[in-house]
């Protein structure tokens, strides 16, 4: 029995290292420390009964915290009542946490395995031109007016651009662009 206790007693360097880890955990997550404290008393009994097992770093940290809690004297009845109330809360808290985990797990399964993935697009509305049609319409309109500015109104080379933009562009657009050209507010690169 003495050999088992000596084997589980950490060396000074291990204790120092574990105290650093415990301090870092408590400073990083003060909410979790409150939850861990009630569990320490229940795990202390398990550690004492099962001293033959090897301890992982987490269990070693728990044993260090247990040693500190056992060495702290309880001077008043209020202090002894507080851990008892904490144990009651600890028993209720894991049950509530398990229920939440079960609900979350069922939601995750439902999200991961959908029956079918349906891609739906809006039906084609021929009142509105497609993106490519819009781009080509604007480009041909600009090319036509560049050609007319360079070669004159009667140039036969410019007729093909006129046919292209008149077939692609809605007449409202052409009327608006013509007004903008006259006003000097046309957004395109015209000469």
From Swiss-Prot:
One GO MF term on file is: copper ion binding
Instruction: For this UniProt record, give its keywords in alphabetical order, as a comma-separated list.
Output: Acetylation, Disulfide bond, Mitochondrion
- The biased composition feature labelled Low complexity covers 72-98
Task: Show the disulfide pairing.
Answer: 137-169, 147-158
Residue spans of biased composition, Basic and acidic residues class: 16-37, 45-56
Gene3D superfamilies attached here?
Cytochrome c oxidase, subunit VIb
Q: Where is this motif: Cx9C motif?
A: 137-147
Location of region: Disordered: 1-126
Tissues where the protein occurs: Expressed in the whole plant.
| Motif (Cx10C motif) on chain | 158-169
State where composition is biased (Acidic residues): 99-114
Where's it found, cell-wise?
Mitochondrion
Q: What is its main location?
A: mitochondrion
Q: Does the keyword Mitochondrion apply?
A: yes
Lineage: superkingdom: Eukaryota
Q: Name one Pfam family in it.
A: COX6B
Residues where N-acetylalanine is found: 2
List, as start-end ranges, the regions of compositional bias called Polar residues.
1-14
What does this protein's UniProt record list under function? Answer: This protein is one of the nuclear-coded polypeptide chains of cytochrome c oxidase, the terminal oxidase in mitochondrial electron transport. This protein may be one of the heme-binding subunits of the oxidase.
Belongs to which family?
Belongs to the cytochrome c oxidase subunit 6B (TC 3.D.4.8) family.
Q: What is this protein called?
A: Cytochrome c oxidase subunit 6b-1
What is the species listed in this Swiss-Prot or TrEMBL entry?
Arabidopsis thaliana
């Amino acid at each position: 029995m003495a050999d088992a206790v000596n084997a589980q007693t950490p060396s000074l360097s291990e204790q120092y290292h574990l105290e650093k880890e415990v301090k870092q955990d408590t400073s990083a997550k003060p909410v979790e420390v409150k939850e861990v404290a009630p569990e320490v008393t229940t795990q202390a009994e398990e550690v004492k009964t099962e001293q033959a097992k090897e301890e992982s770093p987490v269990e070693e940290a728990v044993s260090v915290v247990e040693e500190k809690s056992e060495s702290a004297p309880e001077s008043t009845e209020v202090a002894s009542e507080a851990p008892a109330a904490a144990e009651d809360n600890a028993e209720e808290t894991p049950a509530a946490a398990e229920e939440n985990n079960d609900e979350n797990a069922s939601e995750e399964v439902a999200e991961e395995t959908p029956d079918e993935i349906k891609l739906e697009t809006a039906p084609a509305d021929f009142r509105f031109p497609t993106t490519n049609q819009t781009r080509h319409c604007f480009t041909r309109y600009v090319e036509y007016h560049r050609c007319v500015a360079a070669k004159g109104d009667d140039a036969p080379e410019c007729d093909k651009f006129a046919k292209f933009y008149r077939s692609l562009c809605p007449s409202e657009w052409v009327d608006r662009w013509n007004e903008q050209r006259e006003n000097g507010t046309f957004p395109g690169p015209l000469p």
